[in-house]
Design a protein with these regions (language model features):
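Short, charged/polar, Gly/Pro-enriched secondary-structure boundary elements
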Residues: 49-53, 111-114
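Core segments of cupin and vicinal oxygen chelate
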Residues: 2-3, 9-51, 86
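Eukaryotic phosphotyrosine signaling hubs
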Residues: 5-7, 65-70
């Protein structure tokens, strides 16, 4: 049986501000924006990802800014960082963690933190026998 992670809730204080950040600055695709009384569900997906995030009202009780270090795996960390910086996102410099792993970090307006991650081809894989 396949089990697929497809939706990760992100707690935010201001849905419109967060929606604009993820759509316009980070470049996520807006999949849905549904309102039903007190419930609001905004689903956004990173380009090329099978997993989406959801922000809104009435969907999560976790305090805004409490999600830490969600990873966006990218094929070219320098290009990904440059794209975010060009869009106005404050991103750390790329850090070489050794073993072929590089990362850069940014926060959304509520303080939820994200990591751009690149692992060089073959890094961390056990030797073939």
């Amino acid at each position: 049986m396949d089990w697929k992670l497809e939706l990760v809730p992100i707690p935010v204080a201001d849905v419109e501000r967060a929606k604009a950040f993820y759509k316009d600055k980070v470049g996520f695709h807006l999949d849905h924006d549904v309102r039903n009384g007190e419930l609001r569900v905004v689903q956004l997906t990173p380009h090329g990802s099978a997993c989406s995030i959801v922000i809104g009202k009435g969907i999560i009780d976790t305090p805004p800014g409490s999600v830490q270090r969600l990873h966006l795996v990218v094929p070219d960390i320098h290009a990904a960082r440059a794209e975010l910086v060009e869009r106005g996102v404050e991103v750390t410099e790329v850090q070489d963690l050794g073993g072929g792993i590089t990362m850069a970090f940014f926060d959304d307006p509520d303080g939820n933190s994200w990591a751009l991650q690149h692992i060089a081809p073959g890094a961390g894989r056990p030797p073939q026998s």
